[in-house]
Design a protein with these regions (language model features):
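Flexible helix-coil transition and linker loops at the boundaries of alpha-helical arrays
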Residues: 15-26
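Hydrophobic alpha-helical packing residues
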Residues: 9-12, 87
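Conserved catalytic neighborhood of penicillin-recognizing serine enzymes
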Residues: 1-7
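An aromatic- and glycine-enriched ligand-binding surface/loop that stacks and positions planar moieties
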Residues: 2, 27-34, 41-229
Length: 230
């Protein structure tokens, strides 16, 4: 339940340190427990679960409680707001290191950096395992599916088209995608539409025909036979 998760986070926060020495980067700190609590309460307060009308129509009261609260309660938003404020207060007053990332000057470069640099002080908790250029972990976790060769390593995770469609265009309007079933569209047309998206998309997703590491000048393309390697 939400109460159980919140209670566990609060208990953990009472015992976790604010930071570790650099060699232990990635271990859970107090702020991570506070942030998880804040996220749980934010989800709980959202219309998905905090609503008079459930996202799945059910008549069984027990089943209704399994998919969300039985009714809307505005106080859940107050709990979520207070929990998120506690994370900000911890970052500013207790952590000694957690702050908004303000370098480099270009905001898009800063946005990209949080995806590739686990040491960015804006990140409270990161995955930690990035690997090296020899073990392939970095590529497997960072590259879209099918750009890595199969060999003896698993296919990595990829950004889905549904995820891509969540991004608006640079002008703040929704992108219009060509999705008529059974209809083929020129590859260049799809590329052009991707190029119109919010810069944050290109700072966090690697797509065919783009630079691996923005500004490097090195452009890669995906191939149907999966024979492209980095």
């Amino acid at each position: 339940t939400v109460e159980f998760l919140v209670g566990e986070c609060e208990e953990a926060a009472r015992h976790l340190p604010n930071s570790y020495e650099s060699r232990y980067l990635g271990r859970i700190v107090k702020g991570a427990a506070l942030a998880l609590k804040a996220r749980v309460l934010l989800y709980a307060a959202s219309p998905l679960f905090n609503s008079d009308d459930p996202y799945v129509a059910v008549t069984d009261p027990e089943l209704r409680e399994m998919i969300g609260y039985p009714g809307y309660d505005a106080s859940r938003w107050k709990l979520a707001a207070d929990a998120n404020k506690a994370v900000l207060d911890w970052a500013q007053n207790e952590s000694g290191w957690c702050r908004l990332y303000d370098t480099p000057d270009d905001p898009v470069d800063r946005y990209e950096e949080i995806f590739v640099n686990p040491a960015v002080p804006e990140i409270i908790l990161d995955a930690g395992l990035m690997g090296t250029t020899t073990n392939g972990y970095f590529c497997r976790f960072m590259l879209p599916g099918q750009i890595m060769g199969a060999h003896d390593v698993p296919v990595n995770h990829a950004v889905t088209f549904n995820f891509t469609k969540q991004y608006q265009k640079k002008d703040g309007t929704d992108q219009v995608w060509d999705e008529v079933e059974g209809q083929s569209y020129p590859y260049e047309q799809y590329q052009a539409k991707l190029g119109e998206l919010d810069p944050r998309f290109h700072a966090s997703a690697f797509i065919s025909g783009s630079e691996w590491s923005r500004g490097s000048g090195t452009v890669y393309h995906f191939y149907e036979n999966n024979n492209l390697y980095l």
